């Protein structure tokens, strides 16, 4: 059960890190008074999260190596 959850999380993180979509921040034009630039939508939050995953590719690679080691040593039968 724990092994399945760890594998699921690892695969999900890998999928987010290797996406090659051109994710750019949406440029909003300032409206002046009443500009609500502090709030962002769920889509923008997901986009920012996927962009941040790209910067952590080396750590994700190290996590993958650790998970392979755990799969062989701890979860192997």
Curated annotation (Swiss-Prot):
Topological type in the membrane: Single-pass type I membrane protein
Signal peptide stretch: 1-17
Cytoplasmic membrane side: 77
Key words, A-Z: Membrane, Signal, Transmembrane, Transmembrane helix
Location of the protein in the cell: Membrane
Cellular compartments per GO CC: membrane
Extracellular side: 18-55
This protein's record includes keyword Heme: no
Transmembrane segments: 56-76
Xref: PANTHER family: SMALL INTEGRAL MEMBRANE PROTEIN 7
Family: Belongs to the SMIM7 family.
The name this protein goes by in its record: Small integral membrane protein 7
């Amino acid at each position: 059960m724990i092994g399945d959850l760890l594998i699921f999380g690892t695969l999900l993180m890998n999928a987010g890190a290797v996406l090659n979509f051109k994710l750019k921040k949406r440029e909003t034009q300032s409206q002046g008074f009443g500009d609500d630039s502090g709030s962002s939508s769920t889509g923008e939050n997901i986009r920012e999260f996927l962009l941040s995953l790209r910067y952590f590719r080396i750590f994700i690679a190290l996590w993958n190596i650790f998970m392979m080691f755990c799969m062989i040593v701890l979860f192997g039968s």
